[in-house]
Structures are given as structure tokens and as C-alpha cells.
Regions:
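PLD/PLD-like phosphodiesterase catalytic module centered on the HKD motif
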Residues: 2, 12-169
Length: 169
């Protein structure tokens, strides 16, 4: 079983805990995060993804950063491959944050459940692979060390912002 996630903002503690538990069960998890370096053309602090990434790295989850070059990786995609069981593709407008998932923002998501050889599942898998791996002519992502932030101050700042809702993510 494999779980591939490509997301603009990841900060919801229950989502992070579920991803960590899945990895502990042996699910191969790959997470592709926006480095939160730019938000709509304005330089950012990296909160929340750079801090949340520490929890993923500590759980031995594979992580890469979208190489945004001044833009944002605005996708919100989760793809679960389950061998002979149906695949699940979740995509839409919701970030994996408390504001988005706890009904504080109006969001719309779609879950597509189909056989692993379904054309839409295949296209979603190919898009994730293209973004995860780089080629000689296409560069979409960079390794985990590029944006990792080990600052305890910013980690707890992000946790307070997520818990309180005093944030825009």
C-alpha cells in the first residue's frame, strides 16, 4: 500500500498523526510540500509546512519540496494505492489544516474511488511521479534538506497558530 500526498498547506495535527500511523503500519508514504516561501507573491516564513515536515521526517516518511521558484504549489492531492483493492484519489480546494478541514473555510473536495488501472487514477499517479522525480528537462521538486527548519521557536509558533486559528493557513 502507498499513500502519495501533494499539498499547499499541511498543519492539521490529526492528519499528521494519521499519516505517521500509516507509515508505522508499513504504508509507503511520500509527501510533496510547498515550502511556504511565497504566498501570493509575498515572501513567507515557511510556516506551517517547514515545521510540520519535522514530524514527517522524524517518522521516516519520504519528503520532498515543490521547487516553486517564486510561485506556489497550490495542488491538494491525496492518492492511495492499495494493490488489488480500489485506489482512492482525493482532490479539491481544502488544505490539510484545521481551518480548511474543521469547517472554518468553505471548501469543496472530490473523492474518486476506482480500480488501480482506471485512467483517472493512472493520470493522477503519473502527475505525482512527474512532480516527485525530476528529469533532465523538467524540474519540479527538491530534496528534504532544502527547506527543513529545525527552529523550536517557529515549530511551537506554528503549533499555537494551528491550535488557536490565529493564522491564514
Amino acid at each position: 500500500e502507498r499513500l502519495d500526498i501533494e499539498i499547499l498547506y499541511l498543519s492539521h495535527r490529526r492528519v499528521i498523526a494519521a499519516v505517521v500511523r500509516a507509515a508505522a503500519r508499513g504504508v509507503k508514504v511520500r509527501v510533496l510540500l510547498d515550502p511556504n516561501h511565497h504566498a501570493f507573491g509575498v515572501s513567507g516564513s515557511g510556516i506551517p509546512n517547514r515545521q510540520a515536515a519535522n514530524d514527517l521526517i522524524n517518522a521516516d516518511i519520504q519528503l520532498r519540496w515543490s521547487d516553486t521558484r517564486g510561485a506556489q504549489a497550490h495542488g491538494k492531492v491525496l492518492l492511495r494505492h492499495a494493490g488489488k483493492r480500489p485506489a482512492h484519489l482525493l482532490l479539491g480546494s481544502a488544505n490539510y489544516t484545521r481551518r480548511s478541514l474543521n469547517d472554518l473555510n468553505f471548501e469543496a473536495n472530490l473523492e474518486w474511488v476506482a480500480d488501480s488501472d482506471d485512467e483517472i487514477i493512472h493520470e493522477a499517479r503519473a502527475a505525482f511521479e512527474r512532480h516527485w522525480h525530476n528529469t533532465d528537462t523538467e524540474h519540479y521538486s527538491t530534496g528534504p534538506k532544502a527547506y527543513l527548519d529545525a527552529s523550536r521557536w517557529r515549530y511551537w509558533q506554528y503549533r499555537l497558530m494551528e491550535a488557536s486559528g490565529w493564522c491564514t493557513f
